[in-house]
């Protein structure tokens, strides 16, 4: 039942840190009291709008054990005076007439039911017969009993009888109802429909049960109340035993609640996945981790030597079940019981998987074990429904690998109180960061639900009149659509006097219009009056995005605010919609708002300063301080020059100064900003808006597009789509679902262009458009290349690379929505080759096409030029890797050119999602801080794990075994934590490849020493130098390291393969690929041959099924390197001499003879191309 964590936990870290932290903490129900001896009170969970109800306990049933006898009954009993035996020796409530010394006790819950009230005639006999040892009572004594104990005025009647049974009629319609409200457990209903209709009235009086277990422990419950009997034989067999068993049973509702709420963000691992509508997530937190360890140990100890016997559980009971796979005991809830087959269907509540097992592998849960909440929660993906009505098998196959046993972040959207509490969640995929519902919709497996976001189709829905409504403090029900604030509308060219209310940066600040100052002041007075009249409340939990009233912490005044996020269970991040600033507040400082207070539009206008960009890439504190000084407490003229997606591009001018002061110009003059390449100017008002196709914005904005980008030394899988020559061809990158997105885009584009829309498109060179391709009759994205004199247009199909001539009618205007996907056709050229003549020969083009057409290739980027990307193509589908350029060179179809790109340029083009690859291994140590690793003795052979391979001359390994200085490492971790968390101001830190740094590990948020393996604009890849873990972090999670923290040597070692020289510089990527396939993340044996500048020269051996394999010999065998070690060369010569003197000399001569014959046949064959590779092998 153990679940493998998807990430590498630092196994050698002595600090007992949980493997991960939850984004938002959650609390468990406190376990202050033990269960009562019987019929435990169900503790309420979260408080939904419509509490569900639970079946009434079967012990109570419909028994009527509290009643009064009418006069006819008294007379009837009196008339039986002469009959020798009373028909009920136990009496009305289990009391037997007899001597006091013979009295015993029997639980009243099993007393005999009285005669039916509907019967007109009294019964002649009662089912239960008296025991032999019970003496018949005399008539006088019985008459006295009746007069005394059945008298209405006799107080003993009320003390002897059990408490009245609560009516089980439906609170709304009056019919029989055995279901009760799970919150107050007092009101009964016949169906869910009646409960919903009654909720508006019942919610006023409904209060959660407040169990007092201390009192219950000292006071017998109704079902176990003792009454007196004469002898054990008076009690029906099995009654006492049955009560004892029920007293021991623990139901699912007895477990404590997780206290999860809507909008909370938690993290965990998906341990069971059936389909997107049914999967389980095992939560990760320090509490869960600690409990799982304690539970495992407790169950192992408690149930180690139990004897197998058939325990008969009941549905809904929490038991201990032995899992079939690993034979361990785990908590499970009983889903169903088949007594005849002696089997039960169980669900393991801490993992989510289920199975059918024999009853002899099930035991009741020991009451001494803590009633911790289930560690796995049942979930379904919110905001999406299956496209085909049910989740298809293809969908399950595609999505299960994305989630199963993956550590991911989920956000609770809704909570459904079903038989098992189910959570509607948004799941962020761990690898891509995308939301699962978006992925399902993009892949065509799901659809956006209409009318609801997160409810299942079969889930109970609220009444239509309740949808979209909420109750304010004064119990006035308002529609949520009335609580949406109005937004100020600004147009390009608008100019107004205002004040800057809040500044984050020059690209993120808020302005207020001065003309609305009086209305805003009146609003503040109304807010204060309204909020001061409201009593404090602790049950207000606004949803993210809701508008409410918030009490500002600095002046304790009330303002309108929007809930941005939940910082914890009791605090939220709010943004003040009239000012722009934000802060974290306690929920006690919030209250609901009314529509009247939302009549004034939100006054904070989000702005971006026009014409400037930060000179250093980010805005420095000095630049922000200067801007605040320029506009603080001043009336500023604000001019809107453009409208962005959710903000306005504005110019700020201080006209109170002479001459007028432009904030943008001051920032430029101070050197804090640089001017934008294309300054935004006022747009003409006479823009033509006619003949605009449907779906295209009437306002013509400049279209923006991007190409797929690759960085130098980046290696990707590609397929060639268009070929002009080895110096110009186009490729598709086979990455993730890019081609599927392209196909979907082409379908949408074709549907859009076939709608016979009015076409006002006028071709301009370099402009994107939709173009018709006559080859297959479809529409594709294109760029206008040339406008011909005959009116035709040459277009470049940007996703494929071909250039075609089309007519003006075969062009359409393109919408910006079709430009979101980067252009997929990448222009490439083979690196390090050139044509034999001025132009590429037909033979070279044909041969190149034969080598690459329809084949998945590996491309390594060698250079990036204006004419395309220079790549090295490798065919991995053959028996050995084949470099395409080498094939053309060997066949004398092209010439090899001297590559000017051996050394990597400093200004590499790097995609922001791709990391630079470290190639200059030995020279890449940090210039700022030199660091050292532990040094191993020469000639020592150790076992190690290879962590990362940069080249044959540099790879990192971690020796096996615990380090000797473990205590120092723990002290160092504490020092790093104090150093990195200390408040201080530092300039932006951008580490370089090979630098030593401090890195904050994702799983425990502790700081550790690390080595930089690669960098991008936003991320950095690091290797934790003392533990061997590798992960990619945002730049904010790395800090520079001090020399004092480098005094202790790193526990990893730097290695270089002994005595190898590459035969061909272009094959280095093949060597790295083979090395990674052979020994990356593998346990190998390292023999230290020497140490130079803290780099261990080693020979590497790996054990395989065929014996020990030397890695260097493997490379030499593949012809990718040659051995330059004198000792090894001498050994090879000795081996060759031995073979020359052995008895196989004659056989070797015969082999050489056959080789000559084979070469002769190949040289004289009609088709040279088919045998070139074979000739090459024979000549080598």
UniProtKB/Swiss-Prot annotation:
Zn(2+) 2 binds at residues 181, 184, 202, 206. Residues 1-66, 79-138, 450-469 are annotated as: Disordered. A zinc finger (MYND-type) spans 170-206. It is found in: Cytoplasm. Keywords: Cytoplasm, Developmental protein, Differentiation, Meiosis, Metal-binding, Repeat, RNA-mediated gene silencing, Spermatogenesis, Zinc, Zinc-finger. Its main location: cytoplasm. Zn(2+) 1 binds at residues 170, 173, 190, 194. Testis and ovary specific. Also expressed in several cancers. GO terms for molecular function: zinc ion binding. Residues 27-41 have a biased composition (Basic and acidic residues). GO terms for biological process: germ cell development; meiotic cell cycle; P granule organization; piRNA processing; spermatogenesis; transposable element silencing by piRNA-mediated DNA methylation. Residues 79-91, 110-122 have a biased composition (Polar residues). One of its GO terms (cellular component) is P granule. Residues 312-372, 541-600, 762-821, 990-1048 form the Tudor domain. Belongs to the TDRD1 family. Found in a mRNP complex, at least composed of TDRD1, TDRD6, TDRD7 and DDX4. Interacts with MAEL. Interacts with PIWIL1, PIWIL2 and PIWIL4 (when methylated on arginine residues). Interacts with TDRD12. Plays a central role during spermatogenesis by participating in the repression transposable elements and preventing their mobilization, which is essential for the germline integrity. Acts via the piRNA metabolic process, which mediates the repression of transposable elements during meiosis by forming complexes composed of piRNAs and Piwi proteins and governs the methylation and subsequent repression of transposons. Required for the localization of Piwi proteins to the meiotic nuage. Tudor domains 2 and 3 have higher affinity for arginine-methylated peptides, tudor domain 1 is a poor binder due to an impaired aromatic cage. This is Tudor domain-containing protein 1. It comes from Homo sapiens (Human). The gene is TDRD1.
């Amino acid at each position: 039942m153990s679940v493998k964590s998807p990430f590498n936990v630092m196994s050698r870290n002595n600090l007992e840190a949980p493997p991960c932290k939850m984004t938002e903490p959650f609390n468990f129900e406190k376990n202050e009291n033990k269960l009562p001896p019987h019929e435990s009170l169900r503790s309420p969970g979260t408080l939904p709008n419509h509490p569900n109800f639970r079946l009434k306990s079967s012990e109570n049933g419909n028994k009527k054990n509290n009643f009064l006898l009418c006069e006819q009954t008294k007379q009837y009993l009196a008339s039986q005076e002469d009959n020798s035996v009373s028909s009920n020796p136990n009496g009305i409530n289990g009391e037997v007439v007899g001597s006091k010394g013979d009295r015993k006790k029997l639980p009243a819950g099993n007393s005999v039911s009285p005669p039916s009230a509907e019967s007109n005639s009294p019964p002649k006999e009662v089912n239960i017969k008296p025991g032999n040892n019970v003496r018949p009572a005399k008539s006088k004594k019985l008459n006295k009993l009746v007069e005394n104990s059945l008298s209405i005025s006799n107080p003993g009647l009320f003390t002897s009888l059990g408490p009245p049974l609560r009516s089980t009629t439906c609170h709304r319609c009056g019919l029989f109802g055995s279901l009760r409200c799970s919150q107050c457990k007092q009101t009964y209903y016949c169906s869910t429909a009646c409960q919903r209709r009654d909720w508006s009235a019942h919610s006023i009086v409904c209060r959660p049960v407040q169990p007092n277990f201390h009192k219950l422990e000292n006071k017998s419950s109704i079902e176990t109340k003792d009454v007196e009997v004469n002898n054990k034989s008076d009690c029906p067999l099995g009654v006492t035993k049955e009560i004892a068993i029920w007293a021991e049973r623990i139901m699912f509702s007895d477990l404590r609640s997780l206290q999860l709420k809507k909008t909370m963000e938690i993290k965990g691992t998906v341990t069971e996945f059936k389909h997107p509508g049914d999967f389980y997530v095992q939560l990760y937190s320090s509490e869960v981790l600690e409990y799982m360890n304690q539970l495992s140990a407790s169950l192992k100890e408690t149930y180690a030597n139990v004897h197998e016997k058939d325990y008969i559980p009941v549905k809904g009971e929490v038991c201990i079940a032995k899992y079939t796979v690993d034979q361990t005991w785990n908590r499970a809830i009983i889903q169903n019981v088949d007594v005849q087959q002696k089997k039960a269907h169980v669900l393991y509540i801490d993992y989510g998987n289920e199975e059918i097992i024999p009853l002899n592998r099930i035991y009741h849960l020991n009451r001494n074990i803590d009633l911790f909440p289930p560690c796995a929660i049942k979930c379904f993906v919110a905001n999406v429904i299956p496209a085909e009505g049910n989740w298809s098998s293809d969908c399950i196959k595609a999505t299960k690998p994305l989630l199963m046993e993956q550590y991911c972040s989920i956000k609770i959207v809704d909570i459904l109180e079903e038989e098992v509490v189910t959570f509607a969640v948004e799941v962020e995929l761990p690898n891509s960061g995308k939301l699962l519902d978006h992925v399902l919709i993009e892949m065509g497996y799901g659809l956006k639900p209409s009318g609801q976001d997160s409810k299942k189709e079969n889930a109970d829905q609220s009444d239509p009149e309740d949808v979209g409504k909420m109750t304010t403090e004064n119990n006035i029900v308002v529609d949520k659509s009335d609580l949406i604030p109005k937004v100020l509308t600004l147009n390009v060219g608008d100019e107004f006097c205002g004040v800057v209310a809040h500044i984050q940066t020059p690209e993120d600040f808020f302005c207020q219009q001065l003309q609305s100052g009086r209305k805003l002041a009146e609003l503040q007075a109304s807010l204060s009056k309204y909020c001061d009249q409201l009593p404090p409340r602790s049950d207000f939990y606004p949803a993210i995005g809701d508008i409410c009233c918030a009490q500002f912490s600095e002046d304790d005044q009330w303002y309108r605010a929007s809930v941005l996020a939940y910082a914890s269970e009791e605090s939220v991040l709010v943004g003040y919609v009239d000012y722009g600033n934000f802060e974290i507040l306690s929920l006690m400082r919030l209250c609901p708002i009314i529509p009247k207070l939302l009549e004034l539009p939100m006054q904070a206008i989000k702005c971006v300063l026009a014409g400037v960009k930060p000179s250093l890439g980010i805005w420095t504190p000095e630049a922000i301080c200067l801007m605040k000084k320029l506009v603080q407490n001043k009336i500023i003229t604000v001019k809107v020059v453009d409208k962005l997606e959710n903000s306005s591009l504005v110019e700020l001018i201080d006209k109170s100064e002479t001459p007028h002061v432009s904030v943008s110009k001051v920032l430029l003059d101070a050197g804090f900003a640089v001017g934008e390449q294309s300054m935004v100017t006022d747009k003409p008002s006479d823009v033509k808006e006619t003949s605009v196709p449907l779906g295209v914005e009437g306002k013509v904005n400049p279209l923006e597009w991007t190409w797929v980008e690759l960085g130098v030394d980046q290696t990707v899988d590609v397929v060639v789509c268009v070929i002009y020559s080895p110096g110009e061809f186009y490729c598709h990158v086979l990455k993730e679902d890019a081609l599927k997105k392209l196909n979907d885009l082409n379908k949408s584009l074709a549907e859009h262009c076939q709608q016979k829309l009015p076409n006002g498109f006028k071709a301009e060179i370099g402009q994107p458009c939709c173009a018709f391709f006559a080859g297959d009759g479809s529409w594709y994205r294109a760029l206008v290349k040339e406008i011909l004199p005959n009116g035709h247009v040459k277009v470049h199909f940007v996703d494929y690379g071909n250039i075609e001539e089309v007519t003006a009618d075969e062009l359409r205007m393109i919408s910006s929505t079709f430009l979101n996907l980067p252009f997929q056709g990448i222009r490439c050229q083979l690196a390090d080759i050139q044509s034999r003549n001025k132009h590429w020969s037909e033979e070279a083009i044909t041969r190149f096409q034969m080598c690459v057409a329809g084949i998945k290739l590996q491309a390594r980027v060698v250079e990036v030029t204006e004419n395309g990307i220079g790549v090295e193509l490798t065919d991995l589908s053959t028996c050995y890797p084949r470099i395409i350029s080498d094939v053309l060179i060997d066949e004398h179809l092209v010439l090899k050119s001297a590559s000017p790109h051996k050394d990597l340029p400093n200004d590499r083009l790097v995609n922001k999602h791709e990391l630079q690859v470290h190639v200059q291994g030995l020279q890449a140590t940090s210039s700022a801080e030199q660091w050292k690793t532990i040094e191993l003795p020469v000639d020592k052979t150790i076992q190690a794990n290879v962590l990362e391979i940069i080249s044959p001359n540099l790879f990192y390994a971690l020796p096996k075994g615990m380090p000797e200085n473990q205590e120092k490492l723990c002290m160092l971790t504490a020092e790093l934590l104090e150093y990195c968390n200390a408040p201080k101001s530092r300039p932006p830190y951008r580490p370089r490849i090979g630098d030593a740094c401090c890195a904050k590990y994702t799983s425990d948020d502790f700081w550790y020493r690390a080595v930089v393996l690669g960098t991008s604009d936003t991320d950095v890849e690091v290797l934790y130098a003392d533990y061997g873990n590798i992960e990619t972090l945002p730049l904010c999670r790395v800090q520079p390291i001090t020399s004092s923290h480098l005094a202790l040597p790193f526990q990893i070692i730097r290695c270089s393969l002994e005595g190898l020289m590459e035969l061909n510089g272009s094959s280095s990527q093949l060597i790295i690929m083979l090395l990674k396939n052979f020994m990356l993340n593998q346990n190998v044996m390292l023999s230290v041959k020497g140490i130079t500048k803290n780099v261990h020269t080693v020979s590497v051996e790996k054990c395989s099924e065929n014996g020990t394999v030397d890695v260097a010999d493997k490379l030499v065998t593949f012809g990718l390197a040659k051995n330059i070690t004198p000792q090894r060369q001498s050994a090879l010569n000795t081996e060759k001499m031995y073979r020359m003197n052995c008895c196989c000399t004659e056989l070797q001569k015969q082999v050489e003879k056959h080789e000559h014959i084979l070469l002769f046949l190949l040289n004289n064959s009609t088709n040279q191309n088919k045998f070139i590779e074979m000739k090459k092998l024979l000549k080598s």
